[in-house]
Amino acid sequence: PTSMAGGVTYRYGNKGSYNVRIWAEELQLIDISGLLISISDLHLGNMPGMKSLVLNSITDTRELNLNTFCPNVESINIGSFADLEHLEIEHCSRLRNIQIYSNPKLTSMELGNHPEVEELYCSYNGFSSFSLKGLPKLRSVDLGYNSALASLELDENNGINALLISGCAFQSVDDVLECCPSLNELSCSGNRLTELDLTKHLSI
């Protein structure tokens, strides 16, 4: 390991598959990024001080459970996991920003209720359906280029004002629009839509 301002950096120089387990009650930031580094067992222990988590370019991790290890995290960035299939992010009551992108095998995610989340970016994954329920402060959503995505679950009269779903498989967005009265930005090109009624959303 090498010391840096504000933390410690570990560099894995040899090829191979690693088991990574981390416990650090005072740690505020984790950034595990690499050129498709192989981590077959990624386990994060109790980290009540964690504010920001970045995990990128990792292979051989098929499931990731972030339910209880970082109750005070505010930002999560998980991208370019070549083999990730299932992700759980629950019980993070201070989470504000979620970025889950470029995980081609990710078809299942348990998001739970997050009262402070304002922005959610989940593009270029493998979702066929997605729930946005239990996110009362959510304003901006990017679910673009989930090529199989054809349905959304939404709370009625939510506060979403920007929705990006280009490159998906929606045949209709009528139900989506009905639940989003505050919507003023919509991107929905590259779907299977045959009509688009925006008479109740004149600000778009």
Q: Which residues does each predicted region cover?
A:
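The feature captures the LRR N-terminal capping module
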Residues: 1-17, 99, 121-123, 140-147, ...
